[in-house]
């Protein structure tokens, strides 16, 4: 009996020990598999909830963005920095944009143009249009009678009264093309008529006839500039005449560039400030500082920017920082933070500047841009930057400096826009805003040619000294009339003629 009880107790103890001993490896694996299965189910459930949440949020964002971009106000905000009918410009202008962007631009501007054409005129505008159309009919009668001088004056009067009327532009263009042999200006008026009324079949037919001829003339002009550039490049840098010309032109560049912005310093006073750093009596501190800022910017170009393969936003900011370095050090090198208005042009808002400047930088360094003729490239860059108007002040000076930087990199001397030509300068910029940048490019080409003529004349064997600049408007008009021919010889021109259209020099 005792033996039986003992065995029973041993059996109980063995079962107890069996229940308290650790599990075997097989049990452990089963437990781990169950835990992993449970974790996998939980993880999949969480992932599903996350995906559903992101899908709902993404769908809502896409719907909101579509609704926003479909509104006309959003399109206006994104596209108002471009001029009306910009899609009609030369194909070099939009080659860096995608097909979708081009279609968006065209759709937007087609609507804006049709709206502007169909807009109601004020009573005064209607009166001017009626008078302009009357003058137009009378001009055509005078032309048929053989009185072309009177007809020309009547056409000009009609254009002054209604400069944006397609019929006036069309008929005056035909008169210029067939009677005055001015096919370039005629093509410009046909272009404007099409910009205002794209469905005008007569303007379209005329434009198709003149466009190729005008393009050929422009290309020949650029080839002529290249020939003069090569002739200047053949002159050795050690030439004393070339060094004198560079030094004199350097003073004139600063004088003209600040003069366009309203600075009243004379050329002699500008030269004195740069050479002596002494103040001029009767002139404001800002006028002194504008000259010193241009001097700093031009030295920066000569020392650094000309040698760079690519020009970045940082380089443009550094250039602007020097332009305003003495006038407004706080705003120098900074994008504006407020909306500005420049005559009838409304530049983009400050919130759009970063994106637009990034696009401008991308265009500036693109392969397409580098394939353009240097004069076209420089003129486009000048216009694009001044149109964006990224700074509170100094946009014009910075744009002209950038233009000259690009020209100098291509072997051209830096050119000047004479202060006497200020009204033409702004007029051609206005035409570019309205859709045709070609007149502005031709204006820059004119300035480039006069600069080249200046250097070629100054380095010739003629005994005269480098002349002083003509500064009066009447003298400028007289010299302009004498230099209408684009192929005038440098050796045959008179001394003042060159300096009326002279370009800037770089620091020797």
From Swiss-Prot:
Keywords: ATP-binding, Hydrolase, Membrane, Nucleotide-binding, Nucleotidyltransferase, Repeat, TPR repeat, Transferase, Transmembrane, Transmembrane helix. PANTHER family: FIDO DOMAIN-CONTAINING PROTEIN DDB_G0283145, PROTEIN ADENYLYLTRANSFERASE FICD. The fido domain mediates the adenylyltransferase activity. The side chain of Glu-261 determines which of the two opposing activities (AMPylase or de-AMPylase) will take place. In response to endoplasmic reticulum stress, mediates de-AMPylase activity. Adenylyltransferase activity is inhibited by the inhibitory helix present at the N-terminus: Glu-261 binds ATP and competes with ATP-binding at Arg-400, thereby preventing adenylyltransferase activity. In unstressed cells, disengagement of Glu-261 promotes adenylyltransferase activity. Protein that can both mediate the addition of adenosine 5'-monophosphate (AMP) to specific residues of target proteins (AMPylation), and the removal of the same modification from target proteins (de-AMPylation), depending on the context. The side chain of Glu-261 determines which of the two opposing activities (AMPylase or de-AMPylase) will take place. Acts as a key regulator of the unfolded protein response (UPR) by mediating AMPylation or de-AMPylation of Hsc70-3/BiP. One of its GO terms (biological process) is response to endoplasmic reticulum stress. This is Protein adenylyltransferase Fic. A motif (Inhibitory (S/T)XXXE(G/N) motif) lies at residues 257-262. InterPro entries: Fido (IPR003812), Fido-like_dom_sf (IPR036597), Fido_containing (IPR040198), TPR-like_helical_dom_sf (IPR011990). GO terms for cellular component: plasma membrane. Homodimer. The chain crosses the membrane at residues 48-70. The active site is at 389. It catalyses: L-tyrosyl-[protein] + ATP = O-(5'-adenylyl)-L-tyrosyl-[protein] + diphosphate; L-threonyl-[protein] + ATP = 3-O-(5'-adenylyl)-L-threonyl-[protein] + diphosphate; 3-O-(5'-adenylyl)-L-threonyl-[protein] + H2O = L-threonyl-[protein] + AMP + H(+). Its main location: membrane. GO terms for molecular function: AMPylase activity; ATP binding; Hsp70 protein binding; protein adenylylhydrolase activity; protein homodimerization activity. It is found in: Membrane. TPR repeats lie at residues 132-165, 166-200. Gene3D superfamilies: Fido-like domain, Tetratricopeptide repeat domain. The keyword Transmembrane applies. ATP binds at residues 261, 342-345, 393-400, 425-426, 433. PROSITE patterns: FIDO (PS51459), TPR_REGION (PS50293).
């Amino acid at each position: 009996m005792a033996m039986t009880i003992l065995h029973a107790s041993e059996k109980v103890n063995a079962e107890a020990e069996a229940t308290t001993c650790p599990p075997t490896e097989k049990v452990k694996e089963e437990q781990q598999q169950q835990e992993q299965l449970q974790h996998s189910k939980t993880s999949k459930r969480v992932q599903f909830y996350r995906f559903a949440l992101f899908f709902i949020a993404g769908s809502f964002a896409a719907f909101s963005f579509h609704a926003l971009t479909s509104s006309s106000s959003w399109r206006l905000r994104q596209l108002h920095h471009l001029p009306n009918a910009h899609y009609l410009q030369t194909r070099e202008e939009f080659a860096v944009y995608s097909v979708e962007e081009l279609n968006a631009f065209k759709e937007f501007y087609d609507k804006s143009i049709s709206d502007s054409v169909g807009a109601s005129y004020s009573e005064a505008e209607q009166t001017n249009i009626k008078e302009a159309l009357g003058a137009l009919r009378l001009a055509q009668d005078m032309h048929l009678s053989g009185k072309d001088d009177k007809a020309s004056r009547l056409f000009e009067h009609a254009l002054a009264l209604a400069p944006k009327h397609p019929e006036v532009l069309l008929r005056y263009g035909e008169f210029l093309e067939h009677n005055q042999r001015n096919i370039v200006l005629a093509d410009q008026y046909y272009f404007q008529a099409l910009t205002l009324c794209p469905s005008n079949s007569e303007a379209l037919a005329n434009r198709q006839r003149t466009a190729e001829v005008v393009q050929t003339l422009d290309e020949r002009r650029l080839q002529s500039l290249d020939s003069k550039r090569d002739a200047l490049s053949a002159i050795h840098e050690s030439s004393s005449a070339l060094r004198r010309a560079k030094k004199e032109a350097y003073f004139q560049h600063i004088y003209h560039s600040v003069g366009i912005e309203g600075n009243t310093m004379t050329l002699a006073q500008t030269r004195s400030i740069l050479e002596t750093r002494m103040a001029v009596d009767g002139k404001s501190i800002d006028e002194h500082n504008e000259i010193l800022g241009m001097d700093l910017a031009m030295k920066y170009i000569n020392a650094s920017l000309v040698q760079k393969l690519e020009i970045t936003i940082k380089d443009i900011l550094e250039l602007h920082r020097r332009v305003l370095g003495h006038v407004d050090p706080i705003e120098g090198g900074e994008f504006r933070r407020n909306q500005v208005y420049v005559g009838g042009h409304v530049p983009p808002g400050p919130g759009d500047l970063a994106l637009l400047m990034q696009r401008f930088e991308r265009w500036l360094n693109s392969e397409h841009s580098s394939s353009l003729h240097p004069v076209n490239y420089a003129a486009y860059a000048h216009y694009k930057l001044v149109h964006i108007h990224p700074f509170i002040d100094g946009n014009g000076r910075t744009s002209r400096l950038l233009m000259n930087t690009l020209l100098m990199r291509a072997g051209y001397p830096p050119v000047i826009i004479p202060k006497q030509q200020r009204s033409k300068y702004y007029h051609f910029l206005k035409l570019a805003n309205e859709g045709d940048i070609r007149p502005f490019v031709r204006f820059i080409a004119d300035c480039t040619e006069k600069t080249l003529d200046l250097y070629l004349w100054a380095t010739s064997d003629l005994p005269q000294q480098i002349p002083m600049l003509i500064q009066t408007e009447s003298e400028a008009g007289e010299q302009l009339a004498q230099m209408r021919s684009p192929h005038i010889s440098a050796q045959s021109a008179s001394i003042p003629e060159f300096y009326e259209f002279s370009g800037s020099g770089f620091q020797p």
